[in-house]
Regions:
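A short acidic-Thr-Gly-centered motif at the start of a beta-strand
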Residues: 10-19, 45-47, 78-80, 151-154, ...
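Residue-level marker for buried hydrophobic side chains located in beta-strands
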Residues: 25, 54-56, 87-88, 159, ...
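His/acidic metal-ligating clusters that form di-metal
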Residues: 136-207
Length: 258
């Protein structure tokens, strides 16, 4: 992997001459507040001079050391920059909400309290960051914020959703379970979705973004010790201009092009 400090002279792609807004789409965070703060600094430098939308793909909590700080940072960002910060809900926010209301049995799959609090779920780290023993003790403000998060975002060129979309449904007909949880048949689908689908949810072993003809995965494994990744887009071209992580900019040719 080739990493460089993000700067205009090291741009991986060129912003269209008539572009007016850049979008910085940020992958799964999983309680990694230090990495997130570094990445946001890189995004600010890379997008300097343009109106910028920050779009977070979900999974802010669990596994990492400070879910509470991540939630507070994102909530404060939305308040201080109204209309400029979009936060989507991830399946881990859905799990936290369900755990807080004793509704884990309503979720897809075999999610239960033991799984969520275990090593794969990472819920124990979330509770520890709040200094509490049970999800029902989470601050109402944080639970209300998680419940308010969008499930998807369509900017006309790209469709953003935490996990992806179901290929057998139009983008307008997607349902919550798929937007938050899907892997197959989404990941193996090769035909167009009508937009470039930008998603996370499935950690990439290579720890670099994976750009396909019809989708882009930006979950580079922050929940398992990897970096947090971001993709920079303008409002005139579908594909990303650059990829960043908390460690710096990734040259486009280094990213996976499956």
């Amino acid at each position: 992997m080739t990493l460089n400090p993000p700067s205009p002279s090291n741009a991986s792609g060129s912003v269209a001459e008539d572009a007016s807004v850049l979008t910085c789409a940020i992958g799964d965070v999983h309680g990694q507040i230090g990495k997130l703060e570094l990445l946001l600094d890189h995004c600010e430098r890379r997008c300097a001079g343009y109106a910028t939308r920050l779009l977070f793909i979900g999974d802010y909590v669990d596994r990492g050391p400070d879910s509470r700080a991540v939630v507070e940072l994102l909530r404060d960002l939305q308040r201080s920059r109204p209309g400029e910060v979009v936060c989507l809900r991830g399946n881990h926010e859905a799990v936290v909400l369900a755990a807080a209301s004793d509704q884990l049995h309503t979720l897809p799959g075999d999610v239960d309290m033991e799984l969520w609090l275990g090593p794969s779920g990472g819920g124990l780290q979330t509770l520890a960051s709040y200094g509490i023993a049970h999800a029902s003790q989470l601050p109402a403000e944080d639970l209300e914020w998680m419940a308010s998060l969008l499930l998807s975002y369509d900017d006309g060129l790209r469709y953003f959703a935490h996990a992806g979309v179901h290929p057998e449904r139009s983008l307008a007909e997607q349902v919550e379970d798929d937007l938050l949880w899907i892997r197959e048949p989404f990941l193996s689908h090769e035909s167009t979705f009508g937009r470039l689908v930008v998603h996370g949810h499935t950690p990439l072993k290579a720890r670099v973004p994976d750009l396909r003809a019809n989708r882009l995965n930006i979950d580079t494994g922050a929940g398992y010790g990897g970096p947090i990744a971001a993709a920079i887009f303008d409002d005139r071209q579908r594909n990303p201009l650059a990829f960043l992580t908390n460690a710096g900019e990734i040259r486009m040719e280094t990213a996976s092009h499956g």
